Structure formats: C-alpha cells, structure tokens
Amino acid sequence: MAELPQSRINERNITSEMRESFLDYAMSVIVARALPDVRDGLKPVHRRILYGLNEQGMTPDKSYKKSARIVGDVMGKYHPHGDSSIYEAMVRMAQDFSYRYPLVDGQGNFGSMDGDGAAAMRYTEARMTKITLELLRDINKDTIDFIDNYDGNEREPSVLPARFPNLLANGASGIAVGMATNIPPHNLTELINGVLSLSKNPDISIAELMEDIEGPDFPTAGLILGKSGIRRAYETGRGSIQMRSRAVIEERGGGRQRIVVTEIPFQVNKARMIEKIAELVRDKKIDGITDLRDETSLRTGVRVVIDVRKDANASVILNNLYKQTPLQTSFGVNMIALVNGRPKLINLKEALVHYLEHQKTVVRRRTQYNLRKAKDRAHILEGLRIALDHIDEIISTIRESDTDKVAMESLQQRFKLSEKQAQAILDMRLRRLTGLERDKIEAEYNELLNYISELEAILADEEVLLQLVRDELTEIRDRFGDDRRTEIQLGGFEDLEDEDLIPEEQIVITLSHNNYIKRLPVSTYRAQNRGGRGVQGMNTLEEDFVSQLVTLSTHDHVLFFTNKGRVYKLKGYEVPELSRQSKGIPVVNAIELENDEVISTMIAVKDLESEDNFLVFATKRGVVKRSALSNFSRINRNGKIAISFREDDELIAVRLTSGQEDILIGTSHASLIRFPESTLRPLGRTATGVKGITLREGDEVVGLDVAHANSVDEVLVVTENGYGKRTPVNDYRLSNRGGKGIKTATITERNGNVVCITTVTGEEDLMIVTNAGVIIRLDVADISQNGRAAQGVRLIRLGDDQFVSTVAKVKEDAEDETNEDEQSTSTVSEDGTEQQREAVVNDETPGNAIHTEVIDSEENDEDGRIEVRQDFMDRVEEDIQQSLDEDEE
C-alpha cells in the first residue's frame, strides 16, 4: 500500500472530530431532510417532487405520466437519494387518508388504510392536483429565492410561494436527530379565516384564533374528545389530542345489537386495529363479542361490524374497545418547524404569523417583479411612440446606416433612445406603422401607466398590500374550502368510565338456588296488598327457586359474599338484564367462584373508599366480625378472603354500618340478641371474628341487621310459612355480646321457623320470594305491629310444597306510587273488609305498561271470607301469647 504524502494527513482529536461530524450530520438531517419549512410546510423531498412535476408540465389538465418518470427526473436533478424514498413521499402526498388536501393526483394502487403498500412505480401514474397549483403559483415571478442543486447544474426553489397555509392544512411529521415534529392537519376554510383575523388584528389572542380554528381536521374524520388538549397544543406547541372512532350501536333483530365503526382515528392501521380486537376477544379480555367483520368498500366507505352477544351491553363493550384498542388513541402534537433555517417550537399564532409574513413577502416581490416588467414594457412603448411620431426620419436613418449596429447607434444619438428602445424599433414590423397599430400602442401605453400606478400604490402602502393578500386568500378559500370532517365533542371524556354510558336507574338483582343470576328494572314488580297472590318473578327450572334478591342502582357496586367467606365484586350494570320470566345466566359466568362455593349474601355499596363505613359479618355458628369497608375497595376478578372461620362454619350475612349502630342477630328458633357495634373492635379483612350469640342445640343464625341506639325502626320477622310481623326495636333491650338473646316470635307448626329477621322503618316495600319463584311486593306499613312473642299475620298464601325462600326490602320511589283513580280500584266484601285490586306499575318507557302475570288470580268470595276469619283468629291467638310472654327463654 502506497504511503500518503505527509501534507495530506491532518491529525485531529477523535473526540472533537466525532462531535463536529455528528453535529454536521444532525444539522443536515434537521435542515435538509426531516423538518418542514414554516412558510410552505414542505420538507425538501416534497418540495422537489412538486417542483419537478411543475417543470415537467404535469398539471391537472394534462394526462397522467408514469411515476417512474417523475421519480427519475427528481432524483437526477434535485434529490440525489434512493428512488424508494422519493416514491414513498410522492405516494403519501397522493393518499386521501394521509393528506387532508392531497397534493398529487395518483392513478393506480397508491396503498390503503390497512397498511397495504402502493404498487411499483412502473405501474402507477401521477400528476398535480388543482390545489397544488396554488403552492406553485407565481413561482416564476421572482417571489422566492432559488438555490443551486446538489451538483450546481440546476436551480431549485428554497421555498414555494404557498398561496395557502399548507403547514397546518396538511400537517407534517418527521424524526430528526434529537427532535421530532408532529403537526396535525386542519380545515382550509378555518385556517384562512384565522389568517384573515390575524391580518386585521395582529394582537389577536390564541383563544380568539380558536373561534375561527376549532381544532385539527383529520382526513379520516372521526372524533376529537374535548378541547383541553387542543388549547394546550395551540398555546405551547405541544399537547395531546384524544382521537376516537365514530361508532354507532345498531339493532340487528331478535334483541341483538351490533357496533358499526364508520370512521377511525388518523394514522390508525385498520387491519391492525381489527387484529387487536380479535386478539382481546381470543384472550377473553373483552367478553360479549360474537363476530367481527370488515365490510369496508368503495361504495360504503369504512365499515367495521362487531356483533354483540344478546345478553351483553353494547355500550360497555364499546367503551372497553375505546380503552384497549386503537379505536381511541391520541395524537401527540409537537409543532417544530424551520424558522429562518433553524428548528423552532412554535404555537398556533406563531405559525400563522410566519405564514402571513411569507405571503406579504411573496406578494411584495411579485408586485415588484410586475412593476419592473411593466416599466420595461412602457419604456419600449415610449420608444415606439417616438418612432411613429418621426417615422420618416427613422426610416431614413435606418436606410442610411450600413449595419444594424450603426443604425442602432444612430437612432440612439439622434432621438435620445436607449439601446432597448432602438432595438425594439429595428425589430418592429412594417405593419405596425398603420394607424390602427398606432392606436393600439397608445392604448397599451396608457393602460401600462395606470397599472404601474396601481403597483406603486401597493408597494407604497402596507395596508393595500395586506388587503391584496386577504383578497387572494379569500378566493382560494372560496374555491377549495370545504366542511369540517372531524367532530369535536366537548365533555369529560378523558375519564370516561363504563357507568358514564349506562343510565342510572333502580334495578333488582336476583340469584336462584341453582346459582342463576339476572337483573330487572325495579318497576317490573307492582305493589299489592297483604295477602295477595303475587306475580311470576321467573320461570325456574325443576327444583330451582329464587334464593336471594337485592335492590340497587345500576352504578352501585355489588359485593358478593360466599358461604366460604370470600368476596367478589361487580357493578350493577355488569349483571345481564333479562326478561322477567328468564332463568338468568349461571353466576360463574359473571364471577369466578371456586368449587362448592355459593353466594350467601349480596349487598350494594356506592363508595368502597369510604373510611366512615364498616362491614359486619355473621356466621352460622354465631361468630361476628367488624371490618372497615375500605379494606374491600380493591377486589380482584378472582375474589378475596372476607372472613376466616372453622370448616364446619359458613358465612350467613353481611351488613354495611356507620360504626355507631346496634347489632341485631337472629336465629331460626326465634332468638334475637342486640348489642352495641362499638363492642366489636375493627379487625382485618382476613380475621376470624368473635362470638356474637350463644346458640342452643339445633339452632343457627339466619339474620343480621343493624339499628340506631334511639331508633324508631322496627324488627321485621318473616317465617317460612309466609307469616310476618313488626315489633319496635326498642322492645329488644341491649345486652352483652355473646349472650343467648331473647324471644322474638313464637314458633309453631303453622308459621314455621324464622327465615328473615331485619329492620324496617315502615316506609319500604317488601318483596317476598317463594321456592316456586313467586314474588309478591307489598307495603311494610300494611304488616301488623305485634309484640315480640307473637306468631305474626299471614303475608302471602302459599300453595302445596311452597315456602318462603328469601325476603328483601325495596325503597319506595316515584315509580311505585300508584294513582287510586287510574291504577287501582277498591271494593268492599260482604263482611265489610276492603280489598284492593292489583295495580299495574308503568315501565320507564312512556306509554308502555308492563302487564305482569297473576298466579291463580281467580278466587271466589267464600275464599275471601275464610281468609278474613283466619286473620281474625290469628290476632286473637297473638293477644293470648302476648299475655304469656316471657322475656328470657
């Protein structure tokens, strides 16, 4: 290897060389590749492509030319890089889903929203669009500076005239070294209105500009959620804009629904979006979707169809899709552009100010150019006028000259003409010597003088020049402006949760003995008088019956406590809403129960984070525990331990308390104990608890409830044979925790063991459910108030092999109030007893009443008289028992 001469070797520190070389590279990428110019919104490659199209005459009125020809010309003259980078840039300018206002009119396959690439450049053709001409208009009138190309053999524009604000109209994105830009597209009409407002009020605020420019306007349309992100981006140059697909929920027959997506967020790959949805369904992260189809076509546009299972809530599924898929995404705004050749972060007003200044410069330079041309022409016309005034002398002088040069010099000396004027006279044809041509020259000269005066007036007055800019922008707006595509929705969408999409209403959740669960509107059940037959609450399977029932709001939490001492959580709306006769869905489809685990208690809670509330637990063996509600604020899908106990024990009931209540525990043999809640110290979530009541042989806990110290509430007792009564809470004295309790009812074969012990105020309705699925709703105030030892009065007449399985309180609301004149009538029986007929409670939908089925509604008068006499005998027996009441068993 030959040695290099010493003079060609320069020793440098490697650290300095790396620093300087990398800086040179970085600046080259920033200035000459990745960032757009603030004036025309174009990167060098886009500018060179458009200029190349213009130079080749590929205007909209000409035929398409092969893309390979365009790419080759641009690469050879202006852009010495790979042909693929040039072609990809041109393809993007032709895509109507990438550019709000496409700058290239492509013919052939130019890609799709599914990420499909364009066909090879040898197959596609292109030309300029009409709006592209406005970027290049007046480029040959010295409106911008030209620079040498890469080899110095060609000239290329340093910037385009850009007669519309392309930087914001089509946006830009690019990654440089140490910085990146991401500018969203906007609506041309709004942008030009904003520029016009700025031109009239240079001190305009960004808030005032936003009255004209609402926000980005994406080519794929869709929705923008809220204006806070837009405002932040416009004020600072940086911000995050929430984009969302446009989706509607359609009915598809049979009570089924589908979600149809017709617009997707900007720059989202539709095929990948669909794959993501399918992946979530496959992994069971989103439940309730039965089918997913892409029905997009040229005729219908974007159309992605998502079929929803019949028992699923389409609104909730759609909300989850927004959260977990690209159906909702964000656009990170970073408005960096080249300002005077340097990268700078700009806000909305700065972008418009720089554009307006560029337009003023373009119009000023064009005016100056036109003025020069007009003066040059006027100068020539002045010479021609002189020639026509002295035509004979001009002809004589020319004839006497030996050469053109001598003739020109003679004309200049004799008639005081310039070289250009003399040359124009020598070039003048003889036909211009006619009288008609002389008149034309005079008319043209006078017009030029007026035109020169107008041009000088424009240059002399900045306001006149600015008005010209306004007029030209207005013309472009009227020609190319269109309606906004992207809708901006106002509201707190950033924190949108499932319940925001669910109307809040009172519901009933039922759980059957065989663990089938469902929800119904509370208005499904209608109020009846004591002793009514009830309505069919569900069509139960053989040997199945409703075992539990709670009322709550669709937005409330439902805590499910199991016999094994575990707790699970659902929102009210997450339980499927089914028909009144439906059996429901298996509870294991809603919550992940363990083997041999059944729900023992369901309670509704509004705020799980509350520090002022507690949960009190009672087990079958008389163990009681108090734990803070906040311990249960985070319940996993697979549940958590709520209480620990021995293997032969199980959880009976849970109650929500304020911490200052009295605890009431009742047993199946009609014992009840009352003690202050304060005697129970709060324990951890997994703690075992302490003894609450001492049980006799064969007895077990069936009820748990709470009451205030000076409460006017009453204790409601319901037995398995359909008897019940109310007794004032204060009839039960306070005792120490762990005692045996006092008698709360007399148990006989007629009324049976106690199935429910709870507290009431008298303002509630009561729902009584039998093992046959029959539900009756009655006013608690209609139930007789008796002493502690009374058996109670009949609340519901039971058929053979029927017994009361569960009882629940329902708060009265407006839907439950019936109008005597319109919804109920009263009749008097032969023995003077007033009996009220059933009332129909209107559904929430106006004009649509729910007519519930009546079980064995045909009853004769004799049955009614027997019922009254039996009730009278019950009351006599209760009085006898009261006189023999013993406080302690």
UniProtKB/Swiss-Prot annotation:
Biased amino acid composition, Basic and acidic residues: 863-875
Pfam families: DNA_gyraseA_C, DNA_topoisoIV
EC number(s) stated in the UniProt entry for this protein: 5.6.2.2
Domain Topo IIA-type catalytic: 35-501
Acidic residues: bias regions: 813-823, 876-889
Annotated HAMAP family: GyrA
Protein name: DNA gyrase subunit A
Organism annotation: Staphylococcus aureus
